[in-house]
Amino acid sequence: MKWCKQPKIASNLQMPTITQSQLTFESGSKPIRIDAYIPGSNGTSLPAVIALHGAGGDVAGTEKFAAQLAEQGFAVYVLHYFDRTDTQSADKPTILRNFPVWMKTLWDAISFVEKQPAVDRERIALLGFSLGAYLSLANSTIDGRVKAVVEFFGGLPREMRLFMRRLCPTLILHGEADATVPVAEAYNLQQLLEQKSIPYEIKIYPGAGHGFESEVWRDAGQRALHFLQKYLAAS
């Protein structure tokens, strides 16, 4: 997965000081790491974004993106959901076996994040990459605490459509030439959101595969930021 170095919004505002720490919570009696990136807020509750890595298990790129979002005023939490199953990286059989467990881990992570003193519990979004996008979308169909989802080259598991209680505003970002998660997943999700009259935005990048080159990342980063600012705005 390739990451751009600076996918951030040009601004005349001074960037806030970011406090970074690694916290833990319990899920299934196991300690789960969650990396927090908290901007200074003068005591004001902040919108929160929980970020989920992909099947490779490498959080480095996710953490870079988290730090950039925190610079824009979001409390961002990078979830090490593989801790629940002692997974390093996940192939298809591993994903099928553990997906429900990771779903519960994400549910517990939201419960943990909404109790954090810096967080406005009414303004929580999920942001996921690949497998993390699948988990984010699946959770959003049953968890009313999630107000928005940004999904990079993922999709909604077909099984979740049978148990779907809700959907929320969703940003779909996908490569047209994705050979890992076919772009049909993006269009299927778009169709479902339209059928349910749920606000969404979609950008399909011509020629892009699973993971983006720098120029695409810059555009995707801008879109993600604008979407989160729109749907996590203070009421």
Language-model segments: which ranges?
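A domain-start/cap signature at the N-terminus of enzymes
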Residues: M1-A36
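Serine-hydrolase catalytic machinery in alpha/beta-hydrolase-like enzymes
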Residues: Q22-I38, S45-K115, W217
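Active-site glycine-rich loops that stabilize anionic/oxyanionic intermediates
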Residues: H53-G57, S130, E176
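Primarily recognizes the serine-hydrolase "nucleophile elbow" in alpha/beta-hydrolase
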Residues: L106-L167
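Short beta-strand/loop motif that positions the catalytic acidic residue
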Residues: R166, I172-H174, D178
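Acidic beta-to-alpha connecting loop that harbors the catalytic carboxylate
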Residues: E176-A179, G207-G209
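Conserved alpha/beta-hydrolase "acid-adjacent" motif
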Residues: T180-E185
